[in-house]
């Protein structure tokens, strides 16, 4: 059916099985040292298995000083990264796909914080108008050094087993900053004339050709058009004719392919298109390049289904179809097309949640997420869906994204699923979201579920509103409520219930507003899109009112810029910083937030866009009847497609899970029903290590009122204390997480294990015996031989920790900051949070928990030695008594071998705490389950 898409092709000497290319796109899955994580390898392997003929992983760093583009980004700056990159290439090759590595330097398009606060670099000292970071021009010598770094990166890529490399000369990054007269004002050999502006790239091409084998593919991704006139720029920049000329020059210099793109950060709306851009919109630009080069052309053009790229191949506009976000949404994109399963395709809706989440999640060291594919970038963590061998009956209430995803997931597990939807079509709020102009792609969501749910055997009942009795009639084993929410109507405002007031659902259902004057209250994206819809339907005037001072705060800026441009063209007026105080027959009264001045806005109709209040009544009624109910989507909190889809997936995935005994720092309260002086630790030697974990793991085990630190950092220390002030020498291992109590930052100790001669006395006299968790009987091994460090920790016959490290440098410079930049001769101070409780005896016998408190240990570290370490291997494992593996290692920041003196300066009570509430969280850190279980206490 799509013969051209699946026709074999060739780039240079590299044979490709089809014409489908997975274009590079950052996902945030690399280790902080630039090596691929196991999760990243799995992510790309699935796309190769899903039919991509060529996989180009995300931007790859070639310079660690000025070239950091993302916190978690793969890198070819060091030889030590090659073995793990080899594993990535091998995983892709395993499925018959080929892989190129994209070599990248961001130049000025990166935040200063990723460079340690230093100015970003560029061809000239011209800041990017989007990032607005302080910018300096590279010296001639620095440019020549970067040329060599690109070449060395290609050499390492070939050694790692990649089939080729792509130079990122697009999207406004460093190489494009040299190519464009807009950003290159240099007067040396790398600026001025057309040839000079291209020199940095042509020198890289020549160097790679000299150092790499003849069969190693080499190409350039080029922004052929910068579109800067759309932003009011009058200076010269790369126009399409210039871009074509650049591509021709690169072909002459020796590249094997051109990957056509457009734009830069300042015109980012053209680089990563929002929902309003149609498939294939770049056709003429791509065609212009294809007509002037003879090497293969790869190009993206917002392809969502197979028809447009097939047509482009048929007419000779492209040689290979590049897809980016489409592979996020459906890793089986290629296979489904080749097997004729087009209706089963989960299409990208161009909502840009992926890019929005990539930025939001970066500070938490977490990857992006996809609004329509809940497994995206978490494939390894989730693993295969658990099969429900008992075929439980599940009723899903609500046919929005959350309910549909829950139904799909439960059905894939083998459950018997019935979905009740009161409307006449699946989709829920998405059916309204697709009503505004240019949002037709939103219909991809219901289209997918309308195909897949019947195919999976889900009993879909449209036009059937659920009640407690109707649901109970199915005798469900579980119910998933995706009942959405009801529009918020602030009843205290006079006139709010008038006949001239409606909410968004009704507003988007009307087909005409011809000649009407309309006010929309609420300047979030929903309100703004509703205003556009009303203007498009013929309203004489549309005004948007809100208390906020900027439209749609917190919204993805690309989507907002796109929408605001259209609203201006439609003359939609925004009155921001104004609070609605009254609704009248002829309009509304608003009050300025700044000074309280009131004014009138004339209107025939008032539309409220103030969000939704979760509809939980049905769920509460079912719970009273003894049914297990999960709430998902807007029935939990008002939100968009992404959390609804993820919530539906996780709710259905977790149903009927085997409740076998598991290791955890947090125990159910039902499992528990049976159940000093400042210290000096001189000459303390051993390991300090930091890594990032899943934020949800910390949230699950952190007792209130402690709040997680913005970066989910776990610290591990394993030390031999040779000269403590209160006992003989002993060994100590601490597992902790950074967190806040109010404004106070500190470390919360999850577990403290002791071993050695003085360990038993240390539990009695060391630190604050009443609030620190301590366990004996641990075996320690700390071996340092030259620059090699190896640490092992075991207890009660179970290995808990194994670490191997090479001393000399960290995995990430962030490690140094986490430990407050230690150095020999330096003193630092810290705070540790610990819980205290009393257990007074009862007159009738027994005891109870009371007197709960959070204490702080204020400590001082006096360093004699601090040797940074690069962790080459780490394993954190759990036993029934010590759940040290419950905080999974996502990315290692680094470690150090230290020699120091630690002094506990004092203890103080910070806050009262409910002993009964927090005790389930501290139990595993203080007591052994195995021992108490054998004694019948738990």
Roles of regions detected by a PLM:
Residues 1-397, 401, 409-412, 416-417, ...:
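Flavin-dependent oxidoreductase catalytic cores
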Residues 51, 669-671, 686-688, 695, ...:
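Structured soluble/peripheral alpha/beta segments that form catalytic or ligand/cofactor-binding pockets
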Residues 23, 102-104, 168-170, 176, ...:
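Generic beta-strand/beta-sheet core signal
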Residues 388-422, 461-475, 482-555, 591-658:
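Rossmann-like dinucleotide/flavin-binding elements
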Residues 659-730, 869, 873, 877-879, ...:
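N-terminal domain-onset segments
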